[in-house]
């Protein structure tokens, strides 16, 4: 498989995936194939949303495709925002508003405020559907820390670290993140399939 479509319009995710794959697979984003549609995420699970997006692109363009969905699951909030992480503060999506809402919801919760980030990737190719999952445990900080990354990165501190994803820099984050773990599984699968 030489080229693979990544069903996203999110430039941060696209760059992160390309960086993690280190050029071993050519990744093409949706706008590079002329797809400007916002693919609805209406499933109740991360796997379901990833599959919806991958199926949409695969059916429309007939190309091997993968999509991901990521959720931040906070123990004190019964695993919320979870599958609703991107739209936690409502539509349209707004990362800063999502983080503010999360910190407000946790304002009376004592530390450590345990959480995990989960990414599920759905790949559709000529051989069928394949799923890969990455998960990292951590805690939620009291306030935003750092200026790197995107989404909930400024408030998520991975287990075993003292820096938030936003503080630790792209290189370190891309070695340990939930997405990195899922993409490593995808990469290994693709390289074995060659």
UniProtKB/Swiss-Prot annotation:
Cofactor needs: Mg(2+)
Keyword vocabulary terms for this entry: Hydrolase, Magnesium, Metal-binding, Nucleotide metabolism, Nucleotide-binding
Residues holding Mg(2+): 69
UniProt-annotated catalytic positions: 69 (proton acceptor)
Origin: domain of life: Bacteria
Family: Belongs to the HAM1 NTPase family.
Name this polypeptide is given: dITP/XTP pyrophosphatase
Source organism per UniProt: Porphyromonas gingivalis (strain ATCC BAA-308 / W83)
